[in-house]
Amino acid sequence: MSNTVSLQFPDGSVREYDASMTGAALAESISKSLAKKAVAYAVDGTVRDLSDPLGASGKVEIITREDPRALELIRHDTAHVLAEAVQELFPGTQVTIGPVIENGFYYDFARNEPFTLDDLPVIEKKMREIIQRNKPFTKEVWSREKAKQVFSDKGESYKVELVDAIPAGQDLKIYYQGDWFDLCRGPHMASTGQIGNSFKLMKVAGAYWRGDANNPMLTRIYGTAFANDNDLQAYLHMLEEAEKRDHRRLGREMDLFHFQEEGPGVVFWHAKGWKMFQNLVSYMRRRLDSHGYQEVNTPQVLDKSLWETSGHWGWYRDNMFKVTVAGDDTDDDRVFALKPMNCPGHVQIFKHGLKSYRDLPIKLAEFGNVHRYEPSGALHGLMRVRGFTQDDAHIFCTEEQMAAECLQINDLILSVYKDFGFEEITIKLSTRPEKRVGSDELWDRAESVMMTVLEQIRQQSNNIKTGILPGEGAFYGPKFEYTLKDAIGREWQCGTTQVDFNLPERFGAFYIGADSEKKQPVMIHRAICGSMERFLGILIENFAGHMPLWFAPVQVVVATITSDADEYAKEAAAKLKAAGLQVVTDLRNEKINYKVREHSLQKVPVILVCGKREAEEKTVNMRRLGSRDQESMTLDEAIARLCEEATPPDLLRLKNAG
């Protein structure tokens, strides 16, 4: 066996090295300055400790703090330092798990007295002390017996349970930072000093061990960490901005919706919120109609036999709401379920009546109410609910039509997002997972088509980012995922396009081909908004409640300065309504500044102020939300201007094209 390995560097050069050489020694052999900046290295994309030997040939990269991959290491190491700090400050506290998550990390602790926000500054101070010590991260591999014995002797019962859960034959890695150690898969940076000081503990929360309500309640401390202070401060500023834009707060202030205990995870829509919801549905309905979709509606309650056939009963039963009818006055003892998805119902509509290849593609769309169980702790306003409306569509087509249909879907999705002001879009292709249905040949064909489509999208749209998510596809086929970036830089995964060869086969769906033989259609699942409720939540936060005029539930308030203008205000409001605008009249005996402030808090886009002079001259004083400017104009001019601005973008395009 050779003791040398062949390494290819990012510049394409290839060199031979001793297989026992460590990543740290490799970095130093390139340059001393690189060795000082190195925090880890990677071979064929797998990140390793600098202390690990090279071991095998491959493509090698030295990772520094500036590398995006270093951020996960920084956060991972900070979580370990958090755990050490807690155990130094609060002896007897048990540590459990501390993973890296999106935008940060957390660590769960078992302690008789839960931590509070007041504890965080003290813990942070201790963490900075530990980082200052600059202790090296060192790795040992222990036997299962040793690990269980050591953790048991320390009173770390949760760690013992974690050791028991590690599959036989898998290494049990222990990472030290000075004298403190933890069970961990790694990798880590070279020392605690490489973490830096750009971190912050954010909040505390309760969390059940392993997410099971039957297990003990732990205290979870959340934190975040970045490579530098600028990135940390930018993130904290974004969080402040996000708090101001929180759709739950704005929903209360704007009187859009509410939730209550008797209906956890389902929305009580108020008049203005429901108007906004209907605006979204009306817009989407027009877009679908112009793209050849047929709108349908399928039952919300269906016998479990249908869900067994579809596979949802086996794959998704724990997340479904079951319905049984019991009592002396009924002989119906069947089990039903509220639909969690619309797709099986659409297959039933496709199957109703004989279909020819000449009929394809058939595009069925539904604004379908679906219900999915979510743990109460996961519910979050409109963003995470149990009952919601899915803007589902399913295209039944031939395999030859699949690429063209995916491209048409993409054009529609991007156009919708652009109409709502989202310009930065990322599209990622999720490929076959380990557990899947269908032959490899079928997956090869489907993935090949979607890769071709993705490349065409990339060539046509310069501002669209694309990528691949290996192994992240649905069990029945590959899919595209569409992610939006909002006004404050957050990303939201919304639209999907999924190819499905499985469901038509399960239900025996077919069409008659050109050769007069039965053939199975390809089924393309497509969602643009996804959950309409969630999409509205995203819009509210993106616009900070200041919705575009065409989408606002109340577009104009006509407010009087004195009662002398009441009749004129009523006349003006009537004309505005006749022109198709959503108008409210405010004739209250209040000061005009009070009225303007109140309606501004309600995020009404336009306020038309009418006083005695305006009544005499048939004018209005226009004030825009967020602006101190005032503009005087005739009522007719105001109506013309507002009607143009209040025209939805799809209708405006038709008007301009005509």
Swiss-Prot record:
Residues that, per the record, bind Zn(2+): C343, H394, H525
Entry EC no(s): 6.1.1.3
Cofactor binding annotation: Binds 1 zinc ion per subunit.
Catalytically driven reaction(s): tRNA(Thr) + L-threonine + ATP = L-threonyl-tRNA(Thr) + AMP + diphosphate + H(+)
Any one GO molecular-function label of the UniProt entry: threonine-tRNA ligase activity
Protein biosynthesis keyword on record: yes
Co-factor(s): Zn(2+)
Gene Ontology process terms (BP): threonyl-tRNA aminoacylation
Keywords for the protein's UniProt record, in alphabetical order: Aminoacyl-tRNA synthetase, ATP-binding, Cytoplasm, Ligase, Metal-binding, Nucleotide-binding, Protein biosynthesis, RNA-binding, tRNA-binding, Zinc
Enzyme class: ligase
Record-annotated TGS domain positions: 1-64
Location in the cell: Cytoplasm
Catalytic: region residues: 246-548
Gene Ontology cellular-component terms listed: cytosol
Signal sequence residues: none
Family: Belongs to the class-II aminoacyl-tRNA synthetase family.
Free-text function comment from the UniProt entry: Catalyzes the attachment of threonine to tRNA(Thr) in a two-step reaction: L-threonine is first activated by ATP to form Thr-AMP and then transferred to the acceptor end of tRNA(Thr). Also edits incorrectly charged L-seryl-tRNA(Thr).
Quaternary state and interactors: Homodimer.
PANTHER family in UniProt: THREONINE--TRNA LIGASE, CHLOROPLASTIC_MITOCHONDRIAL 2, THREONINE-TRNA LIGASE
Name of this chain's protein: Threonine--tRNA ligase
